[in-house]
Amino acid sequence: DLLRVISHPPKRFTPLYPEVDFIRVKSYQGTETTGTVTLVSDIDLDVAGRDVVLIEDIVDTGQTLEYLKTHFERYNVKSLATVALLVKESRVTVSHSIEYIGFNVKNEFIIGYGLDINNKMRSINHLREIREL
């Protein structure tokens, strides 16, 4: 949805046509963080000397975001901005800034709209808290 709006914004805005790539990391088992970030698949684009925007769905402790920032610094990017749809502000344990935050949320497990639990419930078209499994 974000890419669609950026590429086809309302008439008062100029459209942007960013190059998009995806990096996959894993740090959860079920509803609990493992404390370790594992790189599942890396980007294919050459981002050296370029401005990069890292978009995170949710920031819990911030360890994954810290890992990704360090990872992208190795590529010698010109600049790195971070965006997060959801931030569990009370759980963030690392000292880095997130330039753009959609919503601060409580310490609940959230699914839907791309967020999953064990690779399930990702396709729900809205966000939802899970209080019990």
What are these regions (language model features)?
Residues 1-133:
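PRPP-associated nucleotide enzymes
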